[in-house]
Amino acid sequence: MNRILSVSFYLFFLYLYIYKTYGKVKNTDQEISNIYGTNYYLRNGFLNGKNGKGNKYEDLQEEGEGENDDEEHSNSEESDNDEENEIIVGQDEAPKSDEAEALKSDEAEALKSDEAEARKSDEAEALKSDEAEARKSDEAEALKSDEAEALKSDEAEARKSDEAEALKSDEAEALKSDEAEARKSDEAEARKSDEAEARKSDEAEARKSDEAEALKSDEAEARKSDEAEARKSDEAEALKSDEAEARKSDEAEARKSEAGTEGPKGTGGPGSEAGTEGPKGTGGPGSGGEHSHNKKKSKKSIMNMLILM
């Protein structure tokens, strides 16, 4: 936007400079008549032209260009000029007087001075315009230079910003990669730790299970041993009891046998009382058979105990 405005201002002032310098023709007849009045032509012999032909004064009167004469000269000067006009128009009349020559010379000097002043003024205006144009051109160049510097600075800043962004992006990527690696390493360590813990737990469980199984087996063995001991003890008690029973039975049988042997003696006697005691003797052998049965039972129990051992 600044560049467009600077170019627009530059073109505008260039147009003004061209218009002031070349847009109007200096020192035309109309401008001279407007500045100095119609008498300028009369005093300088422009009425009939350089070759004495033409009627410039009448043309200016028709166009109304002689009105500025009232502003620059008094009425007395107009009357003198009218007399001079009559003298100039009448080319065939008497020669001009010295007074008219001196007046013409003064007017010519004044005209030259005015022309010099006008030229100086135009030159000053042109110089000012040139200086203004040069200053504007310098300002435009400075503005362009400043814009170029600003553009370079902006580009440098943008490049630095892009480099900083790229560096930040690279650092962020590297940080993410490092974090990912660290996370993977932590996960691997955690997984290894979990696996080790699980393995330890499994081993502990297996050991506990084995110990429990061994304990159960030991308890079972101990229970079996206790049962065997108890059974042995029971069998020993039973054997002792059987032996005691057998011994008691043997003693009883022995007593019965001793009592039974006396029976036949009774039969041999004549007394009835002795004869009646005979049948009791027959009961002795029966009890002896029961004793043999008890002996068989004790033998079986001993055999069973030996088998269990």
From Swiss-Prot:
The keyword Repeat belongs to this UniProt entry's keyword annotation: yes
Biased composition (Basic and acidic residues): 93-259
Bias-annotated ranges (Acidic residues): 60-86
Alphabetized UniProt keyword annotations: Malaria, Repeat, Signal
Residue span of region 2 X 15 AA tandem repeats of S-E-A-G-T-E-G-P-K-G-T-G-G-P-G: 257-286
Positions of the UniProt region annotated as Disordered: 52-309
Cellular component GO terms held in the UniProt record: symbiont-containing vacuole
Ranges of the Sequence repeats in the UniProt entry: 257-271, 272-286
Localization (cell): Parasitophorous vacuole
Segments for region (20 X 8 AA approximate tandem repeats of A-[RL]-K-S-D-E-A-E): 97-256
Function: S antigens are soluble heat-stable proteins present in the sera of some infected individuals.
Name used for this protein in its record: S-antigen protein
Source organism (scientific name): Plasmodium falciparum (isolate NF7 / Ghana)
